[in-house]
From Swiss-Prot:
Belongs to the insulin family. Residues 64-111 form a propeptide. It comes from Conus imperialis. This is Con-Ins Im1. It is found in: Secreted. GO terms for biological process: glucose metabolic process.
Amino acid sequence: MATSLLSPLLVAMLGFLLHVHVARAGLEHTCTLETRMQGAHPQGICGSKLPDIVHTVCQVMGRGYAGGQRQLRKRTSMIDSDDMEAEGGSRGGFLMSKRRALSYLQKETNPLVMAGYERRGIQKRHGEQGITCECCYNHCSFRELVQYCN
């Protein structure tokens, strides 16, 4: 069973390696608001495919990948203590107060606010880096993917 699972994995990795361009050492991609507004790179890896590919690369290299755990921590840290108190803490933060819920329904007319950039403090002149910037909005190399392994 392990051989039958390993063979398609190796074929997929070989195809990926042949597709990936070699990047110069030390090259860091930076994403600005303009980069994000232009959309994903034609050869970028985006969405749910990104953690899957990084996980596969890390497995092939014999390293671990904690991407899922990091995302889980971010989600749990977003639970507001006021929401826990409003619901008595009985649902573990899944329910929120009416005021908090209605705040998400306000109509926004500014496209920067609608995209979430203004709330996160992303400025037009300041860039940010990360796996989404490097591999979705830009084209990342195999070496850059390996850097996200443990």
